[in-house]
């Protein structure tokens, strides 16, 4: 039986999404955390006004990882298909897209989102063993390093189950379900 581990002896592709505007806090914290993990190919969507600042931070914390910084991704579905792991916020659309792509998500909810809805979006997938949830606080950098190191120790089969759970959590044909509910009234 193949017991190969994820993130070992292969280049792991990580997609970082901070939303269409980017996330200054993720842009500052994630390059430092990812410095501690080797053999990564990172594509980081930083937001239109954050490119230079994000590039400087990656240069400051450079290691052997390949990094591509992108202001905005027009064809986001191609990036979802490319990634092994997606590190992102937990807005409803982003969580749905990660699930629909069957990707493994590490969700970092926006801490000041109304009614903490991003936390609950991410918690739903975490509770289904379909993703990881990290809270944005003073420990975020260390928590992310720990999760990525923990992922290194998990068997590929278990990670594949998490990806499958993520895809199963995606609500298929939501417009039909909404229509049916309205029509039933």
Set out the residue ranges of the language-model regions.
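A short, well-ordered alpha-helix in the C-terminal region of glycosyltransferases
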Residues: 157-172
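C-terminal "capping" alpha-helix adjacent to the active site of nucleotide-linked donor transferases
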Residues: 128, 132-157
């Amino acid at each position: 039986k193949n017991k190969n581990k994820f993130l070992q002896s292969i280049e792991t592709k990580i997609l970082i999404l901070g939303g269409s505007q980017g996330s200054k806090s993720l842009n500052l914290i994630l390059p430092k955390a990812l410095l501690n993990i080797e053999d990564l190919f990172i594509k980081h969507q930083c937001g239109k006004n954050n490119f230079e600042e994000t590039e400087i931070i990656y240069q400051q914390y450079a290691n052997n990882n390949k990094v591509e910084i992108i202001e905005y991704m027009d064809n986001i579905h191609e990036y979802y298909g490319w990634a092994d792991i997606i590190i992102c916020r937990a807005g409803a659309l982003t969580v749905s897209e990660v699930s629909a792509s069957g990707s493994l998500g590490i969700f970092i909810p926006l801490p000041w989102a109304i009614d903490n809805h991003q936390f609950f979006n991410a918690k739903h997938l975490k509770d289904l063993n379909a993703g990881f949830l990290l809270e944005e606080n003073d420990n975020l950098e260390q928590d992310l390093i720990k999760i990525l190191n923990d992922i290194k120790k998990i068997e590929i089969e278990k990670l594949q189950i998490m990806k499958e759970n993520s895809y199963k959590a995606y609500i298929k044909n939501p417009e039909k379900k909404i229509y049916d509910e309205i029509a039933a009234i």
